[in-house]
């Protein structure tokens, strides 16, 4: 946890001022996407208080309660509960705090999310065998997925996926999901990201019928499982742009797997990006995602995530 998190008390007048500031934020009001958060912005602390029920005086207590709940549940001998306790052994307070924030400081729900986090790894071991930054680096360099180096005006991390040039014989669906898993773990080390969350932009321009036919329902279910109750991440929105008419067939396969909360956060724009631009400023988006910046550069982002190639740590998650 960063040293700057919650180191002062605010009077109501200050809180009202910060709430007003939250209504008029720009991308410049937020910290970097990559690397740790050295100090949370004051307006982000207020957001955590208002949206996540976070208070400085109860933060440590909530972490302790979750740690105790993990051990109490494991004592029952239930298989998944034991696996959870084994998985979190040696984890610091910052690790537990991610789950508590993701469930708005409700310790019981945070524990259920922790169970989901461990269960996802048990359910899909093929995604986590020998998983490391080096193992997914080539996939990230190819842009599957991408990450904007600037937060959006709401402070969210923006993840990108451009399906047009994706060849499933060169990069498999599982390899893409592995890259997502590594990136999420890495970016969730940042407290600002824990509070503000993520959004995803999926560019389906050039999506072919052959690609659509190659997407198995089991793969799509695996992707949805990753987004729902398997990471201590707040997924705030998923935006689809430039999708062809037959995208509906693929989407209809996915929809039954989506819980109502996530389904309400899916936006399908097509060619009309007017509402899309109300959410995202063009000057933070690459040209291949409807913006004014140069085309997305996956190699540059991989270096920001993992460092130069010769310094990449081969540390399994």
Swiss-Prot record:
Give the SMART domains listed for this entry.
CRAL_TRIO_N, SEC14
* Residues found modified as N-acetylserine: 2
Q: Does the keyword Cytoplasm apply?
A: yes
What does the entry list as the binding residues for 11-cis-retinal?
Answer: 180, 202
The protein's UniProt keywords, in alphabetical order, are: Acetylation, Cytoplasm, Retinol-binding, Sensory transduction, Transport, Vision
For this protein, the record's SUPFAM superfamilies field holds: CRAL/TRIO domain, CRAL/TRIO N-terminal domain
Residues in CRAL-TRIO domain copies? 136-297
Write out the GO biological process terms: visual perception
Localization terms from the record: Cytoplasm
Quote the tissue specificity entry. Retina and pineal gland.
What GO MF terms are annotated? 11-cis retinal binding; phosphatidylinositol bisphosphate binding; retinol binding
Q: Name one GO cellular component term.
A: cytosol
- Kindly indicate whether the keyword Cytoplasm belongs to this entry: yes
Q: Indicate the quaternary assembly.
A: Interacts with DEGS1; the interaction increases synthesis of chromophore-precursors by DEGS1.
Q: What does this protein do?
A: Soluble retinoid carrier essential the proper function of both rod and cone photoreceptors. Participates in the regeneration of active 11-cis-retinol and 11-cis-retinaldehyde, from the inactive 11-trans products of the rhodopsin photocycle and in the de novo synthesis of these retinoids from 11-trans metabolic precursors. The cycling of retinoids between photoreceptor and adjacent pigment epithelium cells is known as the 'visual cycle'.
PANTHER family to which the protein is assigned, alphabetical: ALPHA-TOCOPHEROL TRANSFER PROTEIN-RELATED, RETINALDEHYDE-BINDING PROTEIN 1
Instruction: Give the protein name, as stated in the record.
Output: Retinaldehyde-binding protein 1
Q: Which organism is it from?
A: Bos taurus
Gene giving rise to this polypeptide:
RLBP1
